[in-house]
Design a protein with these regions (language model features):
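A short acidic (Asp/Glu
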Residues: 36-37, 59, 132-137, 161-163
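DnaQ-like (DEDDh/DEDDy) 3′-5′ exonuclease domain used for proofreading
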Residues: 1-49, 54-107
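Active-site donor-binding loop signature of nucleotide-sugar glycosyltransferases
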Residues: 64, 153-155
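Short secondary-structure boundary/capping segments
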Residues: 40-42, 61-68, 137-143, 165-169
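Short acidic loop-to-helix transition motifs that present clustered carboxylates
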Residues: 31-33, 131, 155-159
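Polar, glycine-rich mid-to-C-terminal structural blocks
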Residues: 156, 163-172
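Beta-sheet entry/capping signal
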Residues: 22-24, 44-52, 119-123, 131, ...
Length: 172
């Protein structure tokens, strides 16, 4: 959890009623932003909701610090071959599939814990790919005694005929 040297700058021209609003929209690398927020909101946040990448093998590429535009990054990063085929993914075959995802999540959850008030809560959306691993690191960071429940919601109503009274069409 190294400190960040980054700062937040308001975009007044892109804001609606900037001087009177009590809300913030923040865009940037979420780990850097969390570290910046920690400076002023340490122990003050009542609720955090995060919806991280689900680690399906095709939903994101690691180590993007967003210091370049998307097109610059894609052009310079070697993610695609000359035919436009993606070369860099966190695929299950790379041998570090779960480890890469957990290494991305762990520092973010640690900083998020610093933001939470004593009676604060965190909600995390996830699917079946990483729910067990996410539960383990959350137990380590937040304490297993603080876990309340997994909330299961149906993504889309689509009754299946392959299992009587059971459905696998849900997220957590």
């Amino acid at each position: 959890n190294a400190p960040t040297t980054k700062t937040l700058r308001p975009c007044r021209e892109e804001s609606v009623d900037f001087d009177n609003t009590q809300n913030l929209y923040i865009e940037g690398d979420n780990l850097d932003v969390l570290k910046i927020l920690r400076e002023n909101y340490l122990g003050k946040v009542k609720m955090i909701y995060i919806d991280p990448p689900y680690n399906t093998g095709n939903d994101f590429v690691y180590n993007d610090d967003f210091s370049q535009t998307s097109s610059e990054y894609i052009a310079e990063s070697g993610q695609f071959d000359s035919d436009g085929n993606r070369l860099v993914l966190n695929t299950e075959s790379n041998g570090r599939f779960h480890t890469d995802w957990l290494n991305m999540m762990y520092p973010r959850l640690k900083v998020a814990k610093d933001l939470l008030s004593d009676d604060g809560v965190i909600f995390i959306s996830i699917d079946e790919n990483e729910i067990e691993n996410l539960k383990k690191i959350c137990d380590e960071i937040y304490g297993a005694q603080n876990f309340v429940s997994s909330i299961i919601w149906e993504r889309a109503f689509s009754p299946k005929n392959d299992a009587k009274y059971l459905s696998d069409s849900h997220d957590y």
